[in-house]
From Swiss-Prot:
Top-level taxon of origin: Bacteria
Name listed for the protein in its UniProt record: Leucotoxin LukE
InterPro entries xref list: Bi-component_toxin_staph (IPR003963), Leukocidin/Hemolysin_toxin (IPR016183), Leukocidin/porin_MspA_sf (IPR036435)
One Pfam family matching this protein: Leukocidin
Length: 314
């Protein structure tokens, strides 16, 4: 009965509802880097922020112009910030006076999609491309004249490449993996994994994760859950993504414009904690209570002029 009440109560949650606000956009000047043998990389950067979704997309577009490569290539680095939107609150309603609620990010989502027939993702050139559980993530993409791409961990450094680009981010207590990948899209999930707590290690699906007994029945919602110094950064504040993928385009194609869709966001869990004076604290959990709370931005890319335009967002 208690579980059914908690799940029903979740339907009335308004704390994670986005706040209405326009996006903010900024554009960096074009930078051209000569990489040898007449080849060059034309670099553009777009920043788009949304208070509504608590997300900043910083996307770097690096066009590879190489006469010895039979295709045009675009290296895309997706970085920025995704706010955790973690919150602590009372559960309203008669009988819930001693029940508190924690909303927190079980998973962060980062993705790129295109439906254009003249563009394909190079699946082997995706960072990261395998499951990674380490706290610190750092990998490198290397390019040599003629269309030779390589990526870590198969390479040992940057010195032997005409051009290279790196990713670096921290994911304490989380794990990164590719959820979906094909010639038209790639999606990463940075998911809750293992946590070190004062009571020992706990797995992400443990319903007592982050739950603690308050000092008394009059305690605030915040007192029912672990203090800030016991919460990993991805729960307490948010996540700074850093991911790379590469797209190819047929040289000479009359279709010089392509639509790309970038998605940054989170899936949120709800943890309920109820204090029973005689028996102590009791926890309930709703996994994926709110999924795909994503900020989606649509870009138009011109392969000929290397112009990037923001066409819209959700």
């Amino acid at each position: 009965m208690f579980k059914k009440k908690m799940l029903a109560a979740s339907l009335s949650v308004g704390l994670i509802a986005p706040l209405a606000s326009p996006i903010q956009e900024s554009r960096a000047n074009t930078n051209i880097e000569n990489i040898g043998d007449g080849a060059e990389v034309i670099k553009r950067t777009e920043d788009v922020s949304s208070k509504k979704w608590g997300v900043t997309q910083n996307v770097q577009f690096d066009f590879v112009k190489d006469k010895k490569y039979n295709k045009d290539a675009l290296i895309v680095k997706m970085q920025g910030f995704i706010n955790s939107r973690t919150s602590f609150s009372d559960v309203k309603g008669r009988g819930y006076e001693l029940t508190k609620r924690l909303i927190w990010p079980f998973q962060y989502n980062i993705g790129l999609t295109t439906k254009d027939p003249n563009v394909s993702l190079i699946n082997s050139i995706t960072l990261p491309k395998t499951k990674i559980e380490t706290t610190d993530v750092g990998q490198t993409l290397g390019y040599n004249i003629g269309g030779n791409f390589q990526s870590a961990p198969s390479i040992g450094g940057n010195g032997s490449f005409n051009y290279s680009k790196t990713i670096s981010y921290t994911q304490k207590s989380y794990v990164s993996e590719v959820d979906k990948q094909n010639s038209k899209s790639v999606k990463w999930g940075v998911k809750a994994n293992k946590f070190v707590t004062p009571d020992g290690k706990k797995f992400a699906h443990d319903r007592y994760l982050f739950v603690q007994s308050p000092n008394g029945p009059t305690g605030s919602a915040r007192e029912y859950f672990a203090p800030d110094n016991q919460l990993p950064p991805l729960v307490q504040s948010g996540f700074n993504p850093s991911f790379i993928t590469t797209l190819s385009h047929e040289k000479g194609s009359k279709l010089i414009r392509v639509n790309l869709k970038f998605s940054y966001g989170r899936n949120l869990d709800i943890t309920y904690a109820t204090l029973f004076p005689r028996t102590g604290i009791y926890a309930e959990r709703k996994h994926n209570a709110f999924v795909n709370r994503n900020f989606v931005v649509r870009y138009k890319v011109n392969w000929k002029t290397h112009e990037i335009k923001v066409k819209g967002h959700n």
